[in-house]
């Protein structure tokens, strides 16, 4: 392990964030800290994880949801201080690491089978 990886591991340990195990296809609820002027509140963002990028401290994931009939995708940094919590609502059974094909689908064809175990 080189010096940069070691520093990243120390930083991850210092943050001591509890991050659940999730994968593409899972439905997650991400609680995001939103600052509006002087007020600070939590905003829940629920959707399907379509991609996950594992790069140590720079890890990120993309969550897609349908809002008012329009597809909305948001990229989150896994160790961002803006993320309060991540909750896995449902496990999806998929055979791909990146689910970008869901962008072209709508309705019933965009559904993901639930993992039974």
Curated annotation (Swiss-Prot):
Keyword tags: Ribonucleoprotein, Ribosomal protein
Listed GO CC annotations: cytosolic large ribosomal subunit
Family of the protein in this entry: Belongs to the bacterial ribosomal protein bL19 family.
SUPFAM superfamilies in the record: Translation proteins SH3-like domain
GO molecular-function terms, A-Z: structural constituent of ribosome
Listed PANTHER family: LARGE RIBOSOMAL SUBUNIT PROTEIN BL19M, RIBOSOMAL PROTEIN L19
Domain of life: Bacteria
Protein's UniProt keywords contain Kinase: no
InterPro entries: Ribosomal_bL19 (IPR001857), Ribosomal_bL19_CS (IPR018257), Ribosomal_bL19_sf (IPR038657), Translation_prot_SH3-like_sf (IPR008991)
Protein's job: This protein is located at the 30S-50S ribosomal subunit interface and may play a role in the structure and function of the aminoacyl-tRNA binding site.
Name listed for the protein in its UniProt record: Large ribosomal subunit protein bL19
Annotated organism of origin: Leptothrix cholodnii (strain ATCC 51168 / LMG 8142 / SP-6) (Leptothrix discophora (strain SP-6))
Pfam family, one: Ribosomal_L19
BP terms from Gene Ontology: translation
């Amino acid at each position: 392990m080189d010096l940069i990886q070691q520093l990243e591991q120390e930083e991850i340990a210092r943050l001591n964030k509890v991050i659940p195990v999730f994968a593409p296809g899972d439905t997650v609820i991400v609680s995001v800290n939103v600052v509006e002027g002087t007020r600070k509140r939590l905003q829940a963002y629920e959707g399907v994880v379509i991609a996950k990028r594992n790069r140590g401290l720079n890890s990120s994931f993309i969550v897609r949801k349908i809002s008012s009939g329009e597809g909305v995708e948001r990229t989150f940094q896994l160790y961002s201080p803006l993320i309060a919590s991540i909750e896995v609502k449902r496990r999806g059974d998929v055979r791909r690491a990146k689910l970008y094909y869901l962008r072209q689908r709508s309705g019933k064809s965009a559904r993901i089978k639930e993992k039974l175990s």
